[in-house]
């Protein structure tokens, strides 16, 4: 089977002013609740541009976690404006040995409420959300039956992966866009409600490649209860059911922990002014590195 072709990832140009969408959407998209003592599935944000041909380590591991060749993997290409994105990932998963890979083309909110494809979510072992524009995900899927089923199934054990825009969409608080640079500033990031699989993290992607440290720091200054995950390309955080994570891939993950934040000038800074943050911890983890969320401990990769 010929290798599928993939276009370059979408680069966001959203209005950099910080804003949140209406609160009722946030309520509908609040984190998954596990009510039946089942173990939550993995949450797997990928930084974009994951290796697809020579050594697709991230996708291979996702397939293995989902059950291997007999897994049912649903692909949601809503974020992408390209007609072939979903089909290319379907071909890719089949090349990796998956017998039951299927595209679920949710393009409108009406389809997200009543499409026959809704039932396939309940049969899936894994969901994969492609890259594109995360605002297409939040405005199309947000608060719909699709989003609620994904959250319920993840709480019951189904695994959910997303690359680029699909990664940003996973958390309750989503970075929708922003500016480049390393120093935080009040107007450096745009926030919107995400899918709500977790409220423990705020996720950004294409992190080092697009110089996004400042906008993630800004997001955490507004939401200091969360841990920031900055994902380089071809790098993923495999977040386990207990919210500990392991790094997989060829790049690094920047973990920003504001637990001990003792001072922030965010409340006094004006548009365009730099913001002071004191007490923030930053870790750089590569493949094999781990972060224990409950204790806020980072561990480097094990030497062989």
Predicted regions: what they are:
Residues 6, 20-24:
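Aromatic (phenylalanine/tyrosine) cluster motif
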Residues 13, 19-20:
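Low-complexity, intrinsically disordered or signal/transmembrane-proximal segments
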Residues 26-69, 80-88, 93-95, 175-176, ...:
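C-terminal and late-domain segments of enzyme folds
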Residues 74, 80-123, 129, 136:
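Portal/gating segments that form or line small-molecule/metal binding sites
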Residues 120-123, 143-157:
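Catalytic-core regions built around general acid/base machinery
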Residues 129-131, 150-174:
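Catalytic nucleophile loop
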Residues 134-144:
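Glycine/threonine-rich flexible loop motifs
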